[in-house]
A protein has these predicted regions:
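Aromatic- and Gly/Pro-enriched, solvent-exposed loop/edge beta-strand patches characteristic
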Residues: 27-97
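Short, conserved, surface-exposed binding loops centered on an aromatic residue
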Residues: 1-3, 23, 97
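Extracellular and analogous surface-interaction loops
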Residues: 1-7, 62-66
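A short beta-strand element within beta-rich, extracytoplasmic domains
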Residues: 5-22
Length: 97
């Protein structure tokens, strides 16, 4: 981080873009924030429906993380559906001020 800030908000979305007929389960995408290569308790998740291109969003504000100048911020993305035929698009915006 170039300057000190408090990461207070994650705005996350997920959307199913491609699936096979056998893909009946939704996919939950979760983002975990890392500070200096260590996981923090700040997470955010959204569960994409099985309807193609239906966007599901979530805004998370619990467990803010304070960063000092020189700290590193990392993101770990995980998802619940391991199907090789299900494609979930996801993304997030972060507010650190």
């Amino acid at each position: 981080m170039p300057v000190a800030c408090s990461l207070s908000t994650i705005a996350l979305y997920a959307s199913t873009d491609k699936k096979a007929a056998a893909d009946l389960n939704a996919d939950t995408v979760m983002l975990t924030i890392y500070k200096n290569n260590s996981a923090t308790s700040m997470t955010c998740s959204a569960t994409a429906t099985t309807t193609l291109h239906q966007v599901v969003s979530n805004t998370c504000t619990s467990s803010p993380v304070s960063f000092n100048a020189g700290d590193t911020l990392g993101m770990e993305w995980t998802h619940s559906n391991a199907s090789f035929t299900l494609y979930t698009q996801y993304g997030a915006g972060l507010r650190c001020q």
